Amino acid sequence: MSQRTRLSVNVNKIAVLRNSRGHGAPDVIRAASACIDAGAHGITVHPRPDARHIRHDDVIGLSTLTRARGVEFNIEGNPFAEPRAGYCGLLALCRETRPHQVTLVPDGDQQITSDHGFDFAREGPGLRPLIDEIKQWGCRVSLFVDVNVTGLADAAIWGVDRIELYTGPYAEMHHAGCSDAVLREFATTARLAQDVGLGVNAGHDLSQTNLGVFLGAVPDVLEVSIGHALISEALYEGLIPTVRRYLDILDSVNPAVSMR
């Protein structure tokens, strides 16, 4: 069975806008539902310990929505961030909701956004038991990684299903008009992952401007997770039309790719 690269819409920024006024508008669940209406294949959230955007009740509501609508739910986050008041911890959230995919990300509490991937040599021993636990819940496990990451074969042995390529460096180079070299590095990393049986996702600073070029150069990307750019563009174009524009890019660039 095969499919084109899938689009998972990150709705964190909807929650940022809602939280800025302290009430329920805009409604995160309604926004996610609109994205699904437009054809999005999944919804992504990245809850933070400080609840700066997505909150526990959002995760529960989105889990219910995605299962009812038959699309994937992807929860991202740092598995090493300690639980605290208002945040039960990433693993507890995933245990409760059993998302289709859990993407582990090594971000610190004070980071504005994710900006690097895991160092497998240093962090692998801590990740392995967490991967085992998450897999027991029936969730697919993806690890957020930098281009040129080493240790992909080890990740496959640990039971990791996919990696998510951190595409921030590509977006910067594309904006500067000099992305050819870094695209070759991303393509090489993707092939190395696929050679050891890992599926490849991608995300961070992807936009309508740079997505097509990336997918044209990097082979067999299974899923892109896009939030900030998509929500920003939707302010001008509308949410449903914007999601459809991204789907048009996926359809125009990608032949069908094998699912892993």
UniProtKB/Swiss-Prot annotation:
Binding of 3-amino-2-oxopropyl phosphate, residues: N10, R21, D205, G227, H228
Documented EC number(s): 2.6.99.2
Pathway: Cofactor biosynthesis; pyridoxine 5'-phosphate biosynthesis; pyridoxine 5'-phosphate from D-erythrose 4-phosphate: step 5/5
Catalytic activity: 3-amino-2-oxopropyl phosphate + 1-deoxy-D-xylulose 5-phosphate = pyridoxine 5'-phosphate + phosphate + 2 H2O + H(+)
InterPro entries cross-referenced by the UniProt entry: Aldolase_TIM (IPR013785), PyrdxlP_synth_PdxJ (IPR004569), Pyridoxine-5'_phos_synth (IPR036130)
Keywords: Cytoplasm, Pyridoxine biosynthesis, Transferase
One GO cellular component term noted in the UniProt record for this chain: cytosol
Self-association state and partner proteins as the record states: Homooctamer; tetramer of dimers.
HAMAP family: PdxJ
Function: Catalyzes the complicated ring closure reaction between the two acyclic compounds 1-deoxy-D-xylulose-5-phosphate (DXP) and 3-amino-2-oxopropyl phosphate (1-amino-acetone-3-phosphate or AAP) to form pyridoxine 5'-phosphate (PNP) and inorganic phosphate.
Protein name, per record: Pyridoxine 5'-phosphate synthase
Organism: Xylella fastidiosa (strain M12)
